[in-house]
Every structure is written in structure tokens, then in C-alpha cells.
């Protein structure tokens, strides 16, 4: 099994679990993260309440949150790539694009490649993982957590291969 295959298995497991999105989340266990710490991490009380509502709705629907971790988009990608010894350090979506990917065309992406959003390649603000069949896994936001989304090429500005940079 390749490192790319291991990465895809791990990121899909997190998406299946629907882990929460928290600004600055880098894989901290939810059950070990005090609620005041989440409030400190979030940019506003409104965003903090959105996170709380997401967690509450998942629990009220019967989700087992004991193994959940908190993520933001770059925290999710860098955590997994660091665990698999693909990259050496944590960074932003922009940093992932600049330092840890071989830039490729959005037309030639394959499962495990990363896709990026932003105003342009010098102002990247979001990263997700392409998993094939026009689907991505992303730490989408406070109302959605880590989830599967449809890949719509026109919504993304760049792509990169983190396994061959």
C-alpha cells in the first residue's frame, strides 16, 4: 500500500466521522479540548456558537464524538501528511501550496492530490483533498465540519501533488 493510499484511507475515515471544524484546529481530541479553549481559538462569539451548534446537532443525532478531533482546512491536511512523514511541518493552505506540492493542472488531478481556493495562487485561503469520482474531502467550515463535497473545477484555482514535490 502506498503512502498516498494510506493518506486517502485516513482522510476518508475523518470525513465519515464528520469531525468538527474549529479555526486553528490541528487534530486536537475534542474530548480533551476544554470548551473555553475552543472559544479562544474562534474569531468571534458567533463562530464559537456555530461550532457548539454543530457539535450539539451531531450528538443529538446519535453521533459518537469520543474519537473526534477538531480541524481547520490546513490543519487537517498537514496533520495527516506529517503523520505519514510526507512533510516536515505545519503550515497554512498557502504554505502547503508553496512548499509541499508539485503544481499540477486541475485537469490532471488524481486521488490524493490537493486542490486550492483563493483569489489567485499568491492568495490561497483553502485546501481540500481530491478523492476521485468528482469528490473532495474538506474541513469545510463551522456548519459542516469535515465532509465530502462535490468537486466543481471552476471553484478551485490550483492543484498540487503532495506525494511528488
What are these regions (language model features)?
Residues 1-84, 137-139, 163-164:
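N-terminal capping segments
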Residues 2-8, 78, 85-153, 162-165:
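...with weaker cross-activation on analogous glycine-rich loops/strands in unrelated enzymes
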Amino acid at each position: 500500500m502506498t503512502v498516498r493510499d494510506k493518506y486517502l484511507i485516513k482522510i476518508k475515515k475523518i470525513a465519515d466521522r464528520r469531525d468538527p471544524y474549529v479555526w486553528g484546529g490541528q487534530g486536537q481530541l475534542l474530548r480533551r479540548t476544554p470548551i473555553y479553549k475552543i472559544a479562544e481559538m474562534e474569531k468571534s462569539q458567533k463562530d464559537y456558537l456555530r461550532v457548539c451548534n454543530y457539535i450539539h446537532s451531531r450528538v443529538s443525532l446519535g453521533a459518537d464524538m469520543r474519537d473526534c478531533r477538531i480541524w481547520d482546512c490546513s490543519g487537517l491536511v498537514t496533520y495527516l501528511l506529517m503523520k505519514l512523514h510526507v512533510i516536515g511541518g505545519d503550515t497554512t493552505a498557502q504554505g502547503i501550496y508553496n512548499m509541499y506540492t508539485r503544481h499540477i493542472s486541475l485537469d490532471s488531478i488524481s486521488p490524493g492530490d490537493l486542490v486550492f481556493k483563493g483569489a489567485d495562487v499568491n492568495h490561497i485561503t483553502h485546501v481540500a483533498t481530491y478523492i476521485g469520482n468528482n469528490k473532495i474531502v474538506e474541513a469545510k467550515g463551522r456548519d459542516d465540519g469535515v465532509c465530502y463535497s462535490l468537486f466543481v473545477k471552476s471553484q478551485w484555482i490550483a492543484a498540487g501533488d503532495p506525494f511528488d514535490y
